[in-house]
């Protein structure tokens, strides 16, 4: 299939080159002679040889992972792993979605523990392995099979659900491993090579190109800056490497878009620049420390750009400033538009949010801000992002949430002025599920305190421990109060 495609592509390429020649007999003669010295078959062999070299070099470092959950009711992955559907919650009861990640059907409570199967790759000779968080979260035991068939038990070193990255480790030495390239150097149209274990078919190599960069708002993870590729990524590829033509890791494969579950040419990978920083922290500290500014932001559209007299559509609009935060101390105000930091233009809200999250605490940055039509500079010292104790309390009752952004509200048909926290997944068989809580509902208040952000949630629940949690939940025009007790 690849050979046929390449032959066709090369025929067009060579034909186009000949058509573009000057209409001079001498020039045409020289070009024809050059083409005859380098026929299509030679070009095909060179391209094919490049792919096979990458496959030969990289495949031994790619591993097959089986993760056996602690409990019979496997924690359901966050909704984003299905990609940007018209309704983000359509896929929660889809059978293929469950099979994608080795999960049991939600229509029938599992009677035995089932493994989540995926891919990972070695990043050191002493057994550190990178994969997706959703492959190894809630695990009781992990089995890793190397390319040569050797099997090892693995331990979790660190998890980061916010980027869907994880590091596990096996006890061995002198193992083959992969190195990271720089995803910032990628260009749309560059070759991309994926290696993984789709449907359990180990060491499968697929080839495509970089289709796009900087994909976000897909609801796959909290921090998104995905590489889009048409290299075939299928169920079981999760956690595998996306490589450049030099065999360097440029991304970690994490999701596909597919109405039926099959490959349709749209896959997403976490860029190596983001992944490498997260992985280094997980290996070193077992957890991720993020930078914190303390603002709630809104993306800029054409209408807002005109209202705030911006020269183009860019930047991020400050809608709220957390009291006592670095932003508050520095003097940022509601309706400030952040257009640059440290001289780098803010192309989008997600780009700026990702950049701040990857900063070390105590990093000093200079923000360029548009305030009442004037451009000013504000120095800010980034602090460490607070721990999300409230999130942990909700997770113990089986709920996962995210902030309700204007984009998500619009997609779900929620009034733009609505304040609340969006429920994105509910663990089957959990306390929340048995109480009738479902994805797509909004948490309006917790313990009689109104909440409009995860920061509000954390402040309200920080002292809850194992006490009952009283939620005020809405779905459409229906509002209910639900009392939940976190499991020990």
UniProtKB/Swiss-Prot annotation:
Keywords: Hydrolase, Periplasm, Protease, Repeat, Serine protease, Signal, Stress response. Its main location: periplasm. PROSITE patterns: PDZ (PS50106). Residues 281-372, 388-476 form the PDZ domain. One of its GO terms (cellular component) is outer membrane-bounded periplasmic space. It catalyses: Acts on substrates that are at least partially unfolded. The cleavage site P1 residue is normally between a pair of hydrophobic residues, such as Val-|-Val. It is found in: Periplasm. GO terms for molecular function: serine-type endopeptidase activity. Residues 119-280 are annotated as: Serine protease. Its EC number is 3.4.21.107. Residues 1-20 form the signal peptide. Pfam families: PDZ_2 (PF13180), PDZ_6 (PF17820), Trypsin_2 (PF13365). Substrate binds at residues 236-238, 293-297. The keyword Amino-acid biosynthesis does not apply. The active site is at 134 (charge relay system), 164 (charge relay system), 238 (charge relay system). The keyword Signal applies. It is an enzyme of class 3 (hydrolase). GO terms for biological process: proteolysis. Belongs to the peptidase S1C family. Might be efficient in the degradation of transiently denatured and unfolded proteins which accumulate in the periplasm following stress conditions. This is Probable periplasmic serine endoprotease DegP-like. It comes from Chlamydia pneumoniae. The gene is htrA.
